[in-house]
């Protein structure tokens, strides 16, 4: 599939600078009821480092894709850029007037209606009430929510939530867009419409986009570069095809090892059953 790569920006201008970023959580690396109760009793929790000295830049007008297996720090990275998480060490510098994060479960007040959340979200993105009201009907129409726009967001399905979140960002058009798997949610018709709108938005050479997705096909088509995160660190960054090919090899190896371990476990169970049957005979 041919990539939708933007034209080169004449002068290199940096939109996002991440330098030696560390993000830490207090919690349990591996959950167990016994450990959890013990930590609650003693008041001591382990420190889990979600991001470990991550540094990279994104040029203005470029599209960066982020990949990595579950728990590698992808969503933490986006939330840090969006300002939801503060760095424990390091820094994040943004060179854009407005920034938006598209992610299921982030950004809306559940008790408020979809309509009210449009106003609130727009203000949080840095737009004036007049600017939001100018685009209000377009946002509602694009969302396809109809009268549900006047219902509390807590009553929405994940697909409805995704439609509203995407519509707000797509119509208000921020300078920096952060997208966390949101294009994978919703009905087929809306997916096609939102994907077409996304391609239109990212073709603007003044807009910088960072996308987290498990779809390597989508990333190959849309992105200029790929950042591969592994256990909170950068494993590789560079050309889309080169990085994604290496990443796919890595994931295939993990899947093959998992399948091999499963077969070994099944064989051990069969042997144990046969041994028990022989003993009982």
Where are these regions (language model features)?
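Pre-NBD coupling/linker segments of ABC/ABC-like ATPases
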Residues: 1-49, 240-277
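Conserved ABC ATPase "signature" C-loop
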Residues: 231-232, 247
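H-loop/switch region of ABC-family ATPase nucleotide-binding domains
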Residues: 213-214
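Conserved ABC ATPase "signature" region
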Residues: 35-37, 119, 131-148, 167
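The feature captures the beta-strand-to-loop junction immediately N-terminal to the Walker
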Residues: 67-69
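A short, surface-exposed alpha-helical micro-motif characterized by mixed small hydrophobic
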Residues: 219-221
């Amino acid at each position: 599939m041919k990539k939708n790569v933007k034209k080169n920006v004449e002068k290199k201008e940096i939109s996002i600078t991440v330098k030696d970023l560390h993000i830490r959580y207090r919690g349990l690396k591996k959950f167990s009821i016994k450990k959890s109760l013990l930590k609650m009793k003693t008041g001591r929790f382990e420190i889990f480092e979600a991001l470990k000295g991550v540094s990279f830049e994104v040029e203005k007008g470029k599209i960066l894709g982020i990949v990595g297996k579950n728990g590698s720090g992808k969503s933490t990275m986006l939330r840090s850029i969006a300002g939801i998480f503060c760095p424990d060490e390091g820094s994040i510098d943004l060179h854009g007037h407005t920034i938006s994060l598209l992610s299921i479960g982030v950004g809306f007040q559940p008790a408020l209606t979809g309509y009210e959340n449009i106003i609130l979200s727009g203000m949080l993105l840095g737009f004036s009430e007049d600017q939001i009201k100018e685009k209000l009907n377009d946002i509602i129409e694009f969302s396809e929510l109809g009268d549900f726009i006047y219902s509390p967001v807590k009553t929405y399905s994940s697909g409805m939530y995704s439609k509203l979140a995407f519509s707000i960002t797509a119509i208000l058009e921020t300078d920096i867009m952060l997208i966390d798997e949101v294009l994978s949610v919703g009905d087929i018709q809306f997916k096609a419409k939102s994907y077409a709108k996304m391609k239109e938005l990212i073709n603007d050479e003044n807009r910088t986009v960072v996308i987290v997705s498990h779809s390597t096909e989508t990333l190959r088509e849309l992105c200029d570069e790929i950042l591969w995160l592994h256990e909170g660190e950068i494993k590789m960054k560079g050309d889309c095809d080169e990085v994604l090919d290496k990443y796919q090899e890595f994931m295939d190896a993990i899947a093959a090892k998992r399948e091999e371990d499963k077969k070994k476990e099944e064989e051990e169970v069969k042997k144990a059953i046969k041994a028990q049957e022989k003993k009982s005979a």
